From Swiss-Prot:
Keyword terms: Oxidoreductase, Plasmid
Functional description taken from the UniProt entry: Oxidative cleavage of octopine into L-arginine and pyruvate.
GO cellular component: cytoplasm
GO molecular function, one term: oxidoreductase activity
Protein name: Opine oxidase subunit B
Oxidoreductase is among the record's keywords: yes
Subunit structure: Heterodimer of a subunit A and a subunit B.
Enzyme class label: oxidoreductase
Protein species of origin: Agrobacterium tumefaciens (strain Ach5)
One of the Pfam families matching this protein, by short name: DAO
Top-level division of the source organism's lineage: Bacteria
Annotated PANTHER family: GLYCINE OXIDASE, SARCOSINE DEHYDROGENASE-RELATED
Length: 371
């Protein structure tokens, strides 16, 4: 039987970020990944480094997101050194546009609640009326009544980030095995036996970073990972030399020139196919915000399933019953990548998650049920 010290189950953005961080700290993990056609959030993400509006009624999540966004410049530079790939990080701030006074007021209340709940430690924001928004953003449509602006937000090139993480983790000594889905985990003396269709591996320590499959795998090591279905859809326009004037919650322009339009959510759909109705809604809202987009053709559309926990807040756990088993689950794999690579990986390498992460344990769901 093949024996290793550390295995990460899952090679998406979360698993690769942790694998790279572990490899840099001296722990050279084996990464077992699924197939290309598996339901992967990593290949359908919007690539935002985003803190605006995150952590409503969960101040620890708001501050955790902000901390990761602040670490992203270090992450991007280190990743460039290790992989030779520039992930195109831009952190110039972003807008959330409102198409009604009610929408603007709801967004303002959410941001003020986060500010209050974090005792003013969350990133600063501005509530802008229509004229103030026009002064900063050219070309907005007549229906835009105002916006929220946060200077902490940004984005990266999604495909280059994924490529860079995989290149960097392997150059630092991680071993990557695609098409190796784990069917079962058996705790045993000296670690865990991981079994797949054509392999059996004894690993002293493991990290569950398998996205949607964490829900199935977690109970095998005495953990839980409550997830809810969340399907998102993205439209991509043809490449254009005309720059989108700003980054926003539902629109971003990749550095190659194409404009991505997203921000949908379906909770009762299991099909991977795109919905024409949702495409129409996404396109309509985008055109109401930036009418000039009508000159562009949509050339691609795809969907993905977010790894969204039952309350939307990440889960970081360490099995009490089977020490050596860790779990990480979140739907903010890009934003939190810096924390995962630079902070969480080091704690896993040391064998214990620190107290600051205890509030993210899935035990919170059991406590809620008890109440």
């Amino acid at each position: 039987m093949y024996e290793v010290d550390m295995t990460i189950i899952g090679g998406g953005l979360v698993g690769a970020s942790i694998a790279w961080g572990l490899a840099r700290s001296g722990t050279k993990p084996l990464v077992l990944d699924g197939a290309d056609l598996d339901l992967r959030a990593s290949r359908a993400n919007f690539a935002l480094v985003w803190v605006q509006g995150k952590g409503l009624h969960a101040p620890h999540y708001a501050l955790w997101s902000d901390a990761s966004a602040r670490r992203w410049p270090t992450m991007a530079n280190t990743l460039l050194d290790d992989s030779g790939i520039d992930v195109g990080l831009q952190q110039d701030g972003a807008f959330t546009f409102a198409l009604s006074e009610e929408e603007l007021e709801a967004n303002r209340q959410d941001m003020e609640s986060i500010e209050l709940e974090t005792n003013g430690r969350a990133p600063q924001f501005e509530v802008l009326d229509r004229q103030q928004t026009l002064d900063r953003v050219l070309g907005i449509g007549p229906e835009v009544v105002g916006s929220i602006y946060c200077a902490a937000d940004g984005h990266v090139n999604a495909l280059r980030l994924f490529h860079a993480l995989h290149a960097a983790m392997e150059r630092q000594g991680a071993t990557y095995r695609p098409n190796h889905p784990v069917q079962s985990i058996e705790p045993t003396t000296g670690g865990f036996i991981l079994k797949g269709e054509a392999f059996s591996i004894l690993s002293r320590r493991i990290v569950l970073a398998a996205g949607l499959d964490n829900k199935r795998l977690a109970p095998m090591v005495g953990l839980s990972c409550p997830l809810k279905r969340s399907k998102g859809q993205i439209l991509v326009t043809e490449k254009t030399q005309t720059a989108l004037p700003c980054l926003s919650a539902g629109m971003r322009q990749a550095d190659e020139g194409g404009i991505m339009i997203g921000d949908s959510e379906e909770t009762d759909n299991t099909r991977i196919s795109s919905s024409p109705d949702i495409s129409a809604v996404l396109a309509s809202r985008a055109l109401r915000i930036f009418p000039a987009l009508s000159d562009l053709n949509v050339v691609r559309s795809w969907t993905g399933f977010r790894v969204k926990t039952a309350d939307g807040v990440p889960i970081y756990d360490h099995s009490e019953r089977y020490p050596g088993a860790f779990l990480v689950a979140c739907h903010s794999g890009v934003t939190l990548a810096a924390n995962h690579a630079l902070i969480v990986a080091q704690q896993i390498a040391a064998g214990q998650l620190e107290d600051e992460l205890s509030v993210f344990s899935a035990r919170r769901f059991h406590a809620q049920q008890a109440v």
